[in-house]
Amino acid sequence: MYGGDDYGNNAEYYDEYAHTGDPQLDMEYERNYYASRMPENVKYFLINFCQAIKEGTLYDIQNMYENTFPQISDHHFDKSAWPDEQEVGPIVDNDKVFLILYKELYYRHIHARIPGGPKLDQRINSFFNYCDFFNLIISSQNPVMLELPDIWLWELVDEFVYQFQNFAQYRARLTDKSQDEIQQLCVNHSNVWSILCILNVLHSLVDISNIKKQLEAISQGADPQTVAGDFGKLSFYKMLGYFSLVGLLRVHSLLGDYYQAIKVLEPIEIHKKSAYSHIPACQISTSYYVGFAYMMMRRYADAIRTFSDILLYIQRTKQLYSTRSYQNDQINKQAEQMYHLLAICLVLHPQCIDESIQQVLREKNYHDAMFKMQCGDLDVFKSFFVFACPRFVSPCPPAADAPMEDYVKDPMEHQLMVFMDEVRQQKDLPTTRSYLKLYTTLPLAKLASFIDPNASDDDVSKLLIRLLCFKHKMRNLVWSKGPSGLEGAFKSGSELDFYIDDDMIHIADTKVSHRYGDFFVRKILKFNDLNRKLKKITI
């Protein structure tokens, strides 16, 4: 596997004295043999990495994971795989735990760097390696004493869900596969990367860590350690449980089950900063999928708030992730997607947002596209959605006897159809709103003539349907408080309201002017409270 060479067929590597019959000597021979073919800095990195994981020195593990491993990858393995398990095993005394963790990085590197992506056997082996890891930590009677940095735990869960998504798309593309590959996918390995396996693993991590009970205890001001259990008391299990909740959010979003996507996060107060949200990539990913789910549920006010808050966070914390180029690229792409989704939501549900976000929308020329959407250009809606939506997957793979077609786009086209049906119902509302904002009273017939100069009596009756649609679409469920993101109260999102008496429309501007005095009073009180606390500190 390593380097694409078949070493067994090369006579120059044959050594008749390789095996002596003494296990100790044979192991020493293998260690020296593989080490001699490996760059010295790679060999020493693997030895030190294994030692750091054995000893649980978090600082060293994090430094090697975040800095040394990417640097060696760039220098030695930019377009090729790292050494495989057979080469690494003898160097690290075949340490079982380290080899599982190493293979997680090994297959992740193949997915990210190898041109053409991983082969089928590599995808399958990666799945079974994840199974080995999760069985190790979940099936144990007692907690496994393993220390890994939170960033690795997050990226491990995130990569687990990504490889499921990637495999589902690979499996749905039948046009580039032979009959033998289809046989392997549909018969021999039908359970590999199955949705049931993914959900089972993530829910098991949530359950074993008692993370939901811990989050509920925190929200009630209680000590989470009292409900954490033997496993949940350890940071390793606790953070895996938290990240698994976000993984479940992503999985349900990819399947198009938006209600369940929000439901699974119920212990997490989505709109409040959490003590567990110190990993920027996790916080950004959470907000992206929550905001998208809200948008698809027609809860535009909540979607706008979610996108605005996280985009402000990204603006203010760029320096936290700018040192890791691949993470920077990923976050920048997700931010660009959220600006597209925010533009869609603002067209469908106009409201005020932070001026710095407005400035970005102006600088990146989103306003031109937003104007076209306001004028009913469905193609712009479609292109924005296709660019910004997740890459949906189907929970069921194509059958073994299915026609040899490409089924990858089917889930996305279904979600696009659902979204565009909603847009078509609303595409005329901006025009209606623009006329209503000009008047306090307006006859129905006059409004009908504004919309269509050749309006007939039938058009006036159709106008009533349009006005009813306006009322309905502008009234949305909006979250106000509580741990459940599904809760809320119905509120009108429009800056105007109206009622119809006979043939006359009575319009009221409900826009509330900003009360800056309250804002400054709150800030002054907060500053005074902070000042009192500082004076009490003894140095």
Curated annotation (Swiss-Prot):
Q: Which Pfam family, any one of them, does this sequence belong to?
A: Paf67
The protein's location, in the record's own words, is: Cytoplasm
Q: What is its main location?
A: cytoplasm
Residues annotated as domain PCI: 306-514
Supply one GO BP term: formation of cytoplasmic translation initiation complex
One GO term describing the cellular component = eukaryotic 48S preinitiation complex
Q: Which controlled-vocabulary keywords does the entry list? A: Cytoplasm, Initiation factor, Protein biosynthesis
Enumerate the GO terms in the molecular function aspect.
translation initiation factor activity
Q: What is this protein for, i.e. what is its function?
A: Component of the eukaryotic translation initiation factor 3 (eIF-3) complex, which is involved in protein synthesis of a specialized repertoire of mRNAs and, together with other initiation factors, stimulates binding of mRNA and methionyl-tRNAi to the 40S ribosome. The eIF-3 complex specifically targets and initiates translation of a subset of mRNAs involved in cell proliferation.
Q: Which HAMAP family does the UniProt record give?
A: eIF3l
Q: Which family does it belong to?
A: Belongs to the eIF-3 subunit L family.
Q: What quaternary arrangement does the UniProt entry report? A: Component of the eukaryotic translation initiation factor 3 (eIF-3) complex. The eIF-3 complex interacts with pix.
Q: Which PANTHER family match?
A: EUKARYOTIC TRANSLATION INITIATION FACTOR 3, EUKARYOTIC TRANSLATION INITIATION FACTOR 3 SUBUNIT L
Q: What is this protein called?
A: Eukaryotic translation initiation factor 3 subunit L
Q: Which organism is it from?
A: Drosophila ananassae
